[in-house]
Amino acid sequence: MLEVNQLSVQLGGRSVLQEVNLKLDQGQFMGLIGPNGAGKTTLLRAILGLVPSTGTITWQGQRIDRRAIGYVPQRHAFAWDFPINVRQVVLSGLTGRLGWLRRPRPEHLEAADCALEQVSMSDLRSRPVEQLSGGQRQRVLVARALALKPQLLLLDEPFTGLDMPTQELLTDLFKELSQAGVAVLMSTHDLVAAQAQCEYLCLLNRTDLACAPSSQLKDKDLWMRTFQVRADNPLLQALGMS
């Protein structure tokens, strides 16, 4: 289980997250949703230990080892003009296990190729990444995370800018992973899709306003507070809360 207790983050003297609490069991698929600036990316980065924070974050009761977490950052965060191919990008996700400047062993190559097969990119393993489309790049980043065979997978806006077939491919994959026991935490702006796809939702706006099964989050006032909107906002109608 992932447990986040009383997590607070300050960046540049500004409070970004305040006393966030979250629990995510193995095999659960949770959507992390909230408005722009709500702290979704910061929360994922805090779980990884990439930003200073107060409070506690544990996985299976132990301090988190970020080398064992699968993490898919937003696509623009990766240097796509770097002169490497698809397989090398996926292998870069294993750097924590390989160490710097060490050649990958056969089991590492096998893990990378298996991950590429999971995202239907095996036939492009030798292609330079600068030649990939946006959807292909996103699938490579997912494969990079999956090469670790993680039990905890963090996804930061994985569907941004993707066409519908790619979104469906990745959604099916994330559901399969959760059904196989992987804990999946995904930030997303697609609220309607998150409501339909994710077993659990966490509503975040600098603090957690609710974390519960998506079928139970029907309180209109709660969504209004999360997104700071009026009762007649079309967003609430789209979510079935007219």
Language model region names:
Residues L153-E157:
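Catalytic Walker B motif of ABC-type/P-loop ATPase nucleotide-binding domains
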Residues P128-L132, Q136:
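Conserved ABC ATPase signature
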Residues Y200-S214:
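H-loop (His-switch) and adjacent beta-strand-loop-beta switch element
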Residues P52-I69:
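Conserved ABC transporter NBD signature motif
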Residues P106-L124:
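Conserved ABC ATPase "signature" region
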Residues S215-S242:
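ABC ATPase nucleotide-binding domains
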Residues T188-H189:
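H-loop/switch region of ABC-family ATPase nucleotide-binding domains
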